[in-house]
Amino acid sequence: MQRAGVNPTFTWTPTAQTKIKLSYEYFRDYRTGDRGIPSQNGVPYDRAAPSTFFGNPALSNTPSTQNIVTALVDHKFDDGLNVRSQTRFADYKRFYQNVYPGSAVSASDTLTLSAYNNSNDRQNIGNQTDWTKKFSLGPTQHTFLFGTEFANQKSANARFSGFFTNNNSTTSTAIPASNPVSWQNV
């Protein structure tokens, strides 16, 4: 697993009543997707070490990145009214593919491998604005809150089944459970 991220933030206070905050976040995650140990007769296959990989680790990667920009403006008026508005744009890219046990281990100690890949790209933009007013009415203190929120999201998703090169027409291939790592091209 490899992860890295940064989130620099800049805050500017042009007046005692106004604060502006800008931030950018970048995050990257790369890991191998492991679907675990298959079962045999309804229990985990017990002839494999817990660290055994069933499938193909070189073809089971799950990289993702995210880029997020946020702007926040907070202003307090002299009459007790406060306005706080935050806008955020986010761009997410995620891809994962997996060569994994597609069946339980049979009585003859074989299993089938299956494969797929999936991509998911998403962009969000949104704004949340709150108006808050504190006031007294007789001996009672009140807080009045009014807010709006707007958002838009666009996504592009794709999913594909893997085909194995042993005949290039099936979405699974049989392997011995004693040698569960398959380096066949998918």
List the predicted regions and their residue ranges.
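Transmembrane beta-barrel domains of bacterial outer-membrane proteins
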Residues: G80-V83, D130
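Acidic/polar loop-and-plug regions of large Gram-negative outer-membrane beta-barrel proteins
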Residues: V6-K76, G80, F89-R122, N168-V186
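C-terminal low-complexity, acidic/polar tails when present
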Residues: R122, G126-V186
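Short alpha-helical segments and helix-capping/turn motifs at coil-helix boundaries
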Residues: A4-N7, I68-T70, N127-S136
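Outer-membrane beta-barrel architecture
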Residues: K19, N82, Q141-L145
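Transmembrane beta-barrel strands of outer-membrane/channel proteins
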Residues: M1, L22-R28, S85-D91, F146-N152
